[in-house]
Swiss-Prot record:
This is 3-phosphoshikimate 1-carboxyvinyltransferase. Signal peptide: none annotated. 3-phosphoshikimate binds at residues 21-22, 26, 172-174, 200, 314, 341. GO terms for cellular component: cytoplasm. It is found in: Cytoplasm. The keyword Transit peptide does not apply. InterPro entries: Enolpyruvate_Tfrase_dom (IPR001986), Enolpyruvate_Tfrase_sf (IPR036968), EPSP_synthase (IPR006264), EPSP_synthase_CS (IPR023193), RNA3'P_cycl/enolpyr_Trfase_a/b (IPR013792).
Amino acid sequence: MGSLKIYPSKLSGDVKIPPSKSMAHRAVICSSLSNGKSRISNIDFSDDIIATIRAMTSLGAIIEKKEDILEISGIFSKEGILNRENQLNQPKLTIDCNESGSTLRFLVPISLAFDGVKRFIGRGNLGKRPLDTYYEIFDRQNIKYSYKENQLDLIISGKLKPDEFRVKGNISSQFITGLLFILPTLESDSKIIITTELESKGYLDLTLSTIKDFGVEIINNNYKEFIIKGNQTYKARDYKVEGDYSQGAFYLSADAIGEDISILDLKEDSLQGDSEVVEILSRMGMEILREGNKIKGITNGLNGTLIDASQCPDIIPVLSVVASLSIGKTTIINAGRLRIKECDRLHAINVELSKLGANIEEKEDSLIIEGVSKLNGGVEVWSHKDHRIAMTLAIASCRCDKPIILKDFECVSKSYPHFFKDFKMLGGRIDEWNMGK
């Protein structure tokens, strides 16, 4: 894997943010479960989205790519039914999730709506991410399964039946989303009961909104239980994916530490959970300027605060950079789930930002960060092969006093393939010979 030499830089200008990965996953799945042909626009073909496209194709959806547009004939359309019969006629259908936790956790229950044996494979840390919620359902419904420890090689056979599903809300909302996608298509009614406090509520809001946009109704009883009528049909439609707040957070955080970037295509009333970055940075003292879907931040210094990571775990790495350069103490709580992402993000944040002179104390499910006046450079840092850690360190380099060497930068392709192109466009200085050019 390659390395980049990134120099301290002043970033300025306008940047169009990539489309929301969370919304794109959901739109591809809902349109693939439909009874007709949908058109999904403003798609960014990151590794994770490609994994979901290929997974839905393997189940019978017919998906054609035209620039940033997907035309999708759903599994329950006339064309899709014929294609599905051919696909599922294989002795064992393999679904490659690459490194996408969303693809894996969304597709497992969806695949069980259809006959046949399915094998889920993947790479990286995906095999270490827990699936116990589904294993409990498999045991209760006599669905056969086998798996290997610490790698993704899951084989399942059987069909998911309508039921009352009791699911913990503090593990990952992806399990709930996976069930919400497929239960409306089963032959009778189901119920999901949430047995603990719910984390990542914003992601469920996105799921419920997208499902409704495609013509399926689910009753939400205050996030305590979800009532799902069976025999519903997803309706094909045209759908545009909005800009991604989890990626916009990198540039808003750059503004917070003194850069001058205007971010385009971030909807003000978005349901995305990571839009909480605006409220957090405002609370720390940043002034937010909006003009339609254009946003930028202005600051003359920020103060530490308390950040609850339970509803917005993906933006914690870059907010840790802001906290490191703020006045006073920032405490990040309820962050234990960051340990089971593409890497142990809590540990990676601590190790890599500490190399740059940040003052961080790592606890089991929290970080305590005392602000410093500047960051040091002149060291080698590692992405831990995690896209969000790589982009976080690139933003941190702007406030370093010397260049940094970033190892394994290519992992940004997982969510934001052209991140370093945009970074350079805004004025970031990078030694390009390490980029293979």
